[in-house]
Design a protein with these regions (language model features):
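Short beta-strand-initiation
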Residues: 7-8, 105, 133
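Positively charged n-region of N-terminal signal peptides that target proteins for export
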Residues: 1-4
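Short N-terminal edge-element motif at the start of the domain
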Residues: 54-118
């Protein structure tokens, strides 16, 4: 009975996400779902394709062939258009990028708000611990980190038995439907992942500039 009362008290005092933050998270997730739905329609041919596809192939010293596929999705912005404009200006909404360094494969997504600030980042990073893939989800409000979720799972090409035997992977911990274990979740990001967040934010700015330059070169010529 004492244990039940103690557990109940812990639940009452456990930190919760403020209502305003919950609303922001819900809004970001809704916009993300809408973007995914739009991409599915584009791929099916049921709506016009509105993106730039950039592919880079570079032979890097020591690591060899490096390939990167970047998709820059955009939308038309009526409220910023001149009243006599035939072509409406574009605004970046979403970016996906898949790339490799040697045999390690990375994947990232960036969702932007109407002001061009990143609102959500998803990053799959195989570089934190050898043999494991780390999944990072960063949510932002007005450019500041609002919520972070970090999970990890065994890389599909890794020797799972060896990772368990050497203590890299604790098989006794619970996993989700994808076989991932949650490392942390909340508005405070552990210091060991600060560099990952910093790199992701730099990438968000770099891809936004890439969109602006590409849009100006390919679409701006029509004005």
């Amino acid at each position: 009975m004492r244990r039940l009362i103690f557990t109940f008290c812990l639940l009452l005092w456990a930190p919760s996400i403020p209502l305003s933050a919950q609303n922001t998270l819900s809004s970001i997730r809704q916009r993300y779902a809408e973007q995914q739905e739009a991409i599915r329609h584009m791929e099916a041919g049921s709506m016009p394709r509105e993106y730039y596809h950039v592919h880079g192939a570079v032979n890097l010293p020591a690591t060899g062939q490096h390939d990167e596929d970047i998709y820059l999705y955009y939308e038309e912005v009526e409220e910023r258009a001149d009243e006599n404009a035939i072509y409406l200006p574009h605004r970046l909404t979403f970016v996906t990028t898949a790339y490799n360094y040697s045999f390690r494969r990375f994947y990232e997504e960036f969702l932007y708000d109407a002001d061009g600030r990143v609102a959500f980042i998803y990053a799959r990073n195989p570089d934190i611990v050898f043999g494991l893939d780390y999944d990072f989800r960063f949510y932002f409000s007005r450019g500041k980190l609002l919520h972070a979720i970090v999970k990890r799972g065994i890389n599909k090409d890794a020797d799972a038995a060896r990772l368990i035997a050497n203590g890299t992977w604790n098989a006794s911990l619970p996993t989700d439907s994808e076989g991932h274990q949650q490392v942390c979740a909340g508005d405070k990001l552990p210091k060991e992942f600060h560099s990952v967040l910093a790199d992701c934010l730099k990438s968000a700015k770099r891809y936004h500039k890439l969109f602006q330059d590409t849009d100006r070169a390919l679409y701006g010529a029509l004005f």
